[in-house]
A protein has these predicted regions:
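Single conserved hydrophobic/aromatic residue that forms the stacking wall/gate
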Residues: 246-253
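Transmembrane beta-strands of outer-membrane beta-barrel pores
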Residues: 49-55, 90-96, 134-136, 155-161, ...
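Outer-membrane beta-barrel translocator domains and adjoining extracellular loop/strand segments
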Residues: 57-63, 98-105, 142-144, 162-171, ...
């Protein structure tokens, strides 16, 4: 009888099985997808300096080089997404040009050869801009990217500090070339253009019906904490289940 019980026990052991389940999880992360940041995240401050050239009604009377003057810009803004931001910028300093009218506003000095006069006046241009980070829009978010190109468009107004004081509406556009130095600091090369109402330089007329300024500046941007964007959890897109059945070896009696 003992032999019979041993045989039954061996048969039961042979029928036992162990199931091992293996899961294969494939996770992907959308390089364009980030979590919307709080209001006080991703603010920045920028300052820069460089040179500008004025294009007024009669500025072609003098050489281009003599219309170049110093300029500066100070900006504060926020990135709402890696590809879209807003900023407020104060720019300007001094504009230089020429006129044939001795009685025109902002004339400085005596008559020059060919019958024209120098113009010079101090001004500011306060404008709001919408910025588009093309690298983030087309290549996805990458906080360690060294170079990014950021075009912008905006509108504002000018104010001439020199007398007679004058205000004019302005539209603005440009390109920011951003070079990352650290998590907090960038170097910027900004190329900008402004078109203002024709009265900006104190004269009305000419071929275009507006006055313009082109400028190039080099500056620094500081990004306040909290900076950067967080990504959502990776998504589970597939799951494979594999089962392996292990039978115990049959015991001989």
């Amino acid at each position: 009888m003992l032999l019979a019980l041993a045989g039954l026990s061996s048969a039961a052991m042979a029928q036992q099985k162990t199931e091992v389940v293996e899961y294969e999880i494939i996770q992907v992360q959308d390089k364009y997808q980030v979590i919307t940041n709080p209001f006080w995240s991703n603010w920045f401050f920028s300052i820069g300096g460089g040179a500008e050239a004025t294009f007024g009604d009669n500025d072609s009377a003098g050489s281009f080089g003599k219309r170049i003057s110093p300029t500066l810009n100070i900006s504060v803004g926020k990135w709402f997404t890696p590809g879209l931001g807003l900023r407020l910028q104060y720019s300007g300093l001094q504009a230089r040009g020429f006129t044939y009218d001795k009685g025109a506003d902002y004339v400085k000095g005596a008559e020059l050869k060919d019958g024209y006069y120098k113009q010079r006046f101090d001004y500011m241009n306060l404008h709001g801009d919408v910025m588009f980070n093309l690298n983030a829009l087309f290549g996805g978010y990458n906080q360690h990217r060294v170079y990014e190109i950021i075009p912008y468009v905006g509108a504002g107004f000018t104010h001439n500090y020199s007398k007679p004081h004058r205000e004019a509406l302005s539209v603005n556009a440009g390109i920011i070339n951003k070079f990352r130095i650290s998590n907090a600091v960038d170097i910027n090369l900004e190329l900008s253009a402004m078109a203002a109402e024709d009265k900006f330089d104190g004269e009305v007329g000419g071929d275009h019906g507006y006055d313009g300024v082109l400028s190039a500046t080099v500056g620094l941007t500081y990004r306040f904490p909290a900076r950067g964007f967080r990504r959502p959890m990776p998504q589970l897109i597939s799951q494979d289940r594999k089962s392996t059945r292990l039978n115990s070896s049959h015991c001989s009696t």
